[in-house]
C-alpha cells in the first residue's frame, strides 16, 4: 500500500512540533495494516468514502483509492478536532 499526502496535509504536518508529527505518522502507518488500526469512523455526507482517524485531539481525514495495481491511502487533511470539519 502506498500513502500519498495532499498539499494541505503536508502543510499541516509541517506546522506541528516534531513529537506530535511523529505520533500522527505512526497512527497513519496503522491505517496501512489489514485490518486498519485506530479510532476510525466513516464521515457522513458527500463525497462518500472518506474516513476520519482520531489521534488525540487531532483528526486525519483520508480515503482509499486504487491505481489498478496497488491500493493507495490518500491523506486529505490533518487538523485539530474543532477545525477539521469546517
Regions picked out by a protein language model, each given a short descriptive name:
Residues 15:
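Small, basic N-terminal interaction modules of short regulatory proteins
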Residues 2-3, 7-8, 19-22, 55-58, ...:
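Enriched for short, Lys/Arg-rich terminal
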Residues 8-10, 46:
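Short strand-loop junctions, especially beta-strand C-caps/beta-turns
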Residues 29-52:
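A short, surface-exposed loop/turn module that caps and links secondary-structure elements
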Residues 11, 38, 82:
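Glycine-centered loop/turn positions within well-structured domains
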Amino acid at each position: 500500500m502506498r500513502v500519498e499526502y495532499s498539499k494541505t496535509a503536508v502543510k499541516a504536518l509541517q506546522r506541528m512540533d516534531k513529537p506530535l508529527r511523529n505520533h500522527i505518522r505512526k497512527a497513519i502507518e496503522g491505517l496501512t495494516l489489514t485490518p486498519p488500526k485506530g479510532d476510525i469512523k466513516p464521515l457522513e455526507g458527500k463525497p462518500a468514502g472518506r474516513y476520519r482517524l482520531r489521534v488525540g485531539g487531532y483528526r486525519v481525514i483520508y480515503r482509499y483509492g486504487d491505481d489498478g495495481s496497488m491500493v493507495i491511502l490518500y491523506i486529505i487533511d490533518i487538523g485539530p478536532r474543532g477545525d477539521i470539519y469546517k
